[in-house]
Curated annotation (Swiss-Prot):
Entry's cofactor comment: Binds 2 magnesium ions per subunit.
NCBIfam families xref list: PRK02406.1 (NF002677), PRK03348.1 (NF002882), PRK03858.1 (NF003015), PRK14133.1 (NF010731)
Gene symbol of the encoding locus: dinB
Cross-referenced CDD domains: PolY_Pol_IV_kappa
Family statement drawn from the similarity comment of this UniProt entry: Belongs to the DNA polymerase type-Y family.
Keyword Zinc listed: no
Protein name: DNA polymerase IV
Main location: cytoplasm
Subcellular location: Cytoplasm
Domain UmuC: 6-186
CC annotations in GO: cytosol
């Protein structure tokens, strides 16, 4: 199973860099974008100004005190948008899976791009090189197995840097970092964690999920997962439907992997049918497991090509399940979701090794099954492994 490969690209002091691009005589000076008057806040500052303590969102009047000889410029949003469009055109040369965060920042899922463009590091290096050579500004990039770690990596290598975090070194990378590096940990949460004796991400991992949930509510589950480098949020291009999924809470706990496999097959069949009804396919298979002790984990994998085939969904869901503690811990809930959806109006380049004949056979078989379900009711035809369980639990 291919490990997800996510790149986070963040332009360096974007607004200020565009101003320096258009006004090269200002290079080396403290350039502060946000307005010429004392009203308003700093939108961007050159690294010379940052060295004196100027930061984004700081009141202009404060920035003037820190940097009295600074060059204060008004915001030119149309110009920044123009450059941003060119930056994103470069991103889309490598993958259609680009999630903008702002004009100057984006996530890219390049899991399926490596066959054409080389490793994640090569892709990120080429993107940065193209941006600098064609636009005259610089960018920093972090590469990791998920969005959380890629974002932290790009933050740590600014300005004009590139940092790769191999999947098997994720925890080693995170552990020594201060808790403020974790998404979801703002000033209030940070102060509360410090009161619990927590300063680093390693310290967070010493706390149980129950303790974190008691102190931070639902955000406690997020902090618990992020401290372990777990982040299964997919890269979501704008306008894309988020996901289609189904989950089931059991009347009695599931104890064996074999029984869990049956329910994953059941869920995969239902999700696939819903996908076909919506005329959508999905690229990322996600599973959710909630154990009897209410600890919840998620796992995901991004496919080479989008699918609505129940067998393919189940195959990947089963492999993901093997990465959990199912079989050694009792389970009260299982879920399967497809995300990164592709609809008929969206173009998609098939994978180099896709078999169109096999895909067509699967499509016709699934259409036939859909016809039977539509005519005689949901669950009329089930995989043999499910017949007894579905009837026993009255599930359709």
């Amino acid at each position: 199973m291919t490990e997800n490969l996510i790149i986070h690209v963040d332009m360096d002091a974007f607004y200020a860099s565009v101003e320096l691009l258009d006004n090269p005589e200002l290079r080396g000076q403290c350039v502060i974008v946000g307005g010429a008057s004392n009203r308003g806040v700093v939108c961007s500052a050159s690294y010379e100004a940052r060295a004196l303590g100027v930061r984004s969102a700081m009141p202009i009047v404060t920035a003037r005190k820190l940097c009295p000889r600074g060059v204060f410029l008004p915001v030119r949003r149309a110009r920044y948008q123009e450059i941003s469009r060119k930056v994103f055109e470069i991103f889309h040369q490598y993958t259609p899976l680009v999630e903008p965060i702002s004009l100057d920042e984006a996530f890219m899922d390049v899991t399926s791009s490596t066959r054409l463009f080389g490793s994640g590091e090569e892709i990120a290096a080429n993107i940065r090189r193209q941006i600098e050579s064609s636009l005259g500004i610089t960018a920093s990039a972090g590469i990791a197995k998920n969005k959380l770690v890629a974002k932290i990596a790009s933050d740590l290598c600014k300005p004009n840097g590139l940092l790769v975090v191999p999947a098997d070194q994720t925890q080693e990378f995170l552990d020594p970092l201060p808790i403020s590096r974790l998404w979801g940990v703002g000033p209030a949460s940070r102060n509360k964690l410090i009161s619990l004796g927590v300063k680093t991400i390693r310290d967070v991992r010493k706390l149980t999920q129950e303790m974190l949930s008691a102190n931070f509510g639902r955000n406690g589950e997020v902090i618990y997962a992020f401290a372990r480098g777990m982040d299964d949020r997919p890269v979501e291009p704008p306008g894309a439907a988020k996901s289609i999924g189904r989950e089931i809470t059991f009347d009695r706990n599931v104890y064996t992997l074999e029984e869990a496999y049956k329910w994953m097959l059941f869920l995969s069949e239902r999700v696939a049918r819903r996908m076909r009804k919506e005329e959508a396919t999905g690229r990322t298979v996600n599973i959710k497991v909630k154990y009897a002790d209410f600890i919840q984990v998620t796992r995901s994998v991004t496919l080479e090509s989008p699918t609505d085939d129940p067998g393919e969904i189940y195959t990947h869901a089963k492999k993901l399940l093997q990465k959990t503690l199912v079989g050694s811990k009792a389970v009260r809930l299982l879920g399967v979701t497809l995300s990164q959806l592709v609809t008929p109006g969206q173009a998609w380049q098939p994978g180099l090794f896709d078999d169109p004949t096999a895909s067509e056979r699967k499509r016709k078989l699934n259409q036939a099954l859909d016809g039977i379900w539509d005519r005689f009711g949901s669950g009329t035809v089930e995989p043999a492994a499910l017949v007894t369980d579905v009837a026993k639990h009255n599930l359709r």
